[in-house]
Structure formats: structure tokens, C-alpha cells
């Protein structure tokens, strides 16, 4: 066996070749289009986003149906999956956080700019935000272990994509 970061479900080295779905690709139809592109390209892996606000639409309410569908769709055509976790920040913007976070800047603090005003970005130094993102991410990882541990369709999870 050579050196590799990835192994398939049988422990064999696996070199992922594929495409990354657009960061706004969500839902079964868009994922199917991305899968078709990977297959047309001759790839073996899809990178696709999972958004915090879709995973936790309300505080402490976690919905894994979209994650399950994403795994099922890639597994059905023999592809591997790398999940892109879009949590508290993407390119510095909180586009993918739940509404309860966006609507509560007193708890989930914004970045303070050089002039003392707030910027439209969640502060990476805010413990409340970090704990909520961490909890949602932990729920995702627990689901992945429970749902995909045997088949190992998911190769990796990229944390805080971009």
C-alpha cells in the first residue's frame, strides 16, 4: 500500500477525482445535475455543500434528510462524497447560518471594524457562535457515523469551506 489520505470501504488506497458542486447547489435535483457532471467527466467523487441553516432550521432542531439524500444519491451511482461544511462563515459572510443566529447579534456577535462599527460578519472570537456552530457540526458528524459508517460513501468533511 502506498501513502494516501483516502481509503475505500475495503481499506484500499483511493484517489478522488471529481468536481465540486456550486456552493448554492442544494436539493435533490441540483445534486443530481452535479452527479451527472462528475460521471460525464469520468470522476469518482463529488464535493457538495451542507449548510448550517438547512441542518438546524430552528435552534436545537436538526434535520438530516438533505444529508441523507446527498449520501444516497452519490452512493446509488457508485461515487464517493466529500462534504463541504458551510457553517458560521463563507468568505467572511454569515450567509449559511440559521435565522436565530442572524437575528440575534447581541448573542452572536458581529465583527467590530477599525472605526468601531460592526461589519456584516460573525466574529470568530464570539464563544456563543463557536459553540452553536460546533454543536451543529457535531450533530452532522454523529449522523454521518451512524448512517454511513459501514458503506463509507463519505470520504471527508471540509470544515468551514472557504
Question: Would you name each region that the model predicts?
Answer:
Residues 14-18, 45, 78-82, 152-158:
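Structural preference for beta-strand elements that scaffold enzyme active sites
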Residues 42, 49-51, 123, 148-161:
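Conserved alpha/beta enzyme-core scaffolds, especially Rossmann-like or related mixed alpha/beta domains
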Residues 18-23, 48-50, 83-87, 159-161:
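A cross-domain feature marking catalytic cores of carbohydrate-active enzymes
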Residues 30-107:
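Aromatic-lined substrate-binding rim segments of carbohydrate-active enzymes
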Residues 11, 46, 74, 140, ...:
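Conserved, mostly hydrophobic/aromatic
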Residues 1-44:
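N-terminal carbohydrate-binding accessory modules
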Residues 67, 88-148:
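Active-site-adjacent "subsite" loops/lids of carbohydrate-active enzymes
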Residues 24-31, 60-64, 126, 130-137:
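Solvent-exposed, acidic/flexible segments
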